């Protein structure tokens, strides 16, 4: 997350963002697991506060703010599959109300060994061991491809030299009917 945020601001020629907004489905799971394990192991006694600080969901956003010495708006959304969309919507609202000129917005998540095992056993992940890369996403098997990573974008209310894209809009959709969801995606494309 830190490197991704540095790359985004460097490419946008932004020295210090006015706001930092991060979306994460689950936060820093490995650090949370470590903290809770130590809490149990030491019977809630003799714990360093650092372990707790690193286990909170806003750890990445706060580390980025410290790095940039940014004392402005800083928020983290933990809305599972809608986290990045929520962060992006917040960024666009800040820009629209002219509360910020440049907003660093990103999404980040990690997969832990325990988390992967649980999700895999529940059938959420595809078995990718026998699939070739070129057919991986066209395969009609059940589940998703497990992944983790970070992506950050420097978003501005005005076009700047080197701009890569324009955000035409954000729409968060929720469907219970698969056919309705497919039709809506076709309309957007």
Question: What positions do the PLM features span?
Answer:
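Active-site-proximal alpha-helical scaffold in enzymes
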Residues: 2-7, 11, 65, 76-106, ...
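Acidic, glycine-rich active-site loops and adjacent beta-strand->loop/helix elements
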Residues: 24-27, 80-83, 108-112, 171-175
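Flexible, glycine/proline-enriched loop segments at strand-loop-helix junctions
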Residues: 47-52, 74-82, 141-142
